[in-house]
Amino acid sequence: MAVTPYVDTSRLDGKVALVTGSGRGIGAAMAIHLANRGAKVVVNYANSVEAANKVVDEIKSRGGEAIALQADVGEVSQTTKLMDDAVAHFGQLDIVCSNSGVVSFGHLKDVTEEEYDRVFRINTRGQFFVAREAYKHLSVGGRIIMMGSITGQAKGVPKHAVYSASKGAIETFVRCMAIDCGDKKITVNAVAPGGIKTDMYHAVCKEYIPNGENLTDEEVDEYAKTWSPMDRVGQPMDIAKVVGFLASEDGEWINGKVIGIDGAACM
């Protein structure tokens, strides 16, 4: 009786992945993790070329292949060029992770038109057109993975209407886009992180804590870890591992879904 050889379907060997906003934080963790799984990676950045190059260097130090490409995904023409350049460099594109985003807090009475537009330009409009261009450039059977937020699903957060709404729209995007992308067998999903300890973590986290502005960074950590029964704060790699799964063959039958990743946190 012939034995079927084992194939590690979690691997991404032969695939090319592009991660927007991957010079730092969750995006950097995604890029590094996808490379660790075998993918060649395009590290996108808007302004921080030094940070992006550090991610590329780390990937290469582990034996992977990566390139840093600049583009502001708030400008559709730059998004199109980013995808064109990725395909020109690596010859194909199989995975697009739409990670770029901005955060915003402000009471309803204080939110300006400029602030509203700034947030939706990247978090919502930007992600929509990243997905559009991904559809055009991805190989058959590709993956689009978008970035939501637990605030798009959770109870109301004070002074967070604009940001939460900009992320809530992503949930509708993935449900509809998954149908549109079916003709190319492309899956479309999103991850919705809770609080994740990135370089912006302490400043942002204080906004979720009553009187948080008076807490030290250590006190913020102690408070925030109580949100999860796991008694710890989320890390960028917690998100990257789920993205790696969705990007792999193992995640093929997950489509049109938003996966909350918050350690069962209750803010």
Curated annotation (Swiss-Prot):
An example molecular function term from Gene Ontology annotations: tetrahydroxynaphthalene reductase activity
Disulphide bonds annotated for this chain are: none
> Could you name the domain of life of the organism this protein comes from?
Eukaryota
Q: Give the UniProt keywords, A-Z.
A: Melanin biosynthesis, NADP, Oxidoreductase
Q: Could you tell me which pathway this protein works in?
A: Pigment biosynthesis; melanin biosynthesis
Q: Which Gene3D superfamilies match?
A: NAD(P)-binding Rossmann-like Domain
* Binding-site positions, NADP(+): I26, D72, N99, R132, Y163, K167, I196, T198
Output the InterPro entries linked to this UniProt entry. NAD(P)-bd_dom_sf, Sc_DH/Rdtase_CS, SDR_fam
CDD domains attached here? THN_reductase-like_SDR_c
Q: Does the entry feature the keyword Hydrolase, yes or no? A: no
A biological process (GO) of this protein is: melanin biosynthetic process
Catalytic residues, chain numbering: S149 (proton donor), Y163 (proton acceptor), K167 (lowers pka of active site tyr)
Its Enzyme Commission number(s) read 1.1.1.252
Q: Mind telling me which PROSITE patterns this protein's record contains? A: ADH_SHORT
Show the catalytic activity: scytalone + NADP(+) = naphthalene-1,3,6,8-tetrol + NADPH + H(+)
Known role: Probable tetrahydroxynaphthalene reductase; part of the gene cluster 29 that mediates the biosynthesis dihydroxynaphthalene (DHN)-melanin, a bluish-green pigment and a structural component of the conidial wall. Catalyzes the NADPH-dependent reduction of 1,3,6,8-tetrahydroxynaphthalene (T4HN) into (+)-scytalone.
Q: How does it assemble?
A: Homotetramer.
Annotated family: Belongs to the short-chain dehydrogenases/reductases (SDR) family.
What's the name of the protein? Probable tetrahydroxynaphthalene reductase MYCGRDRAFT_87994
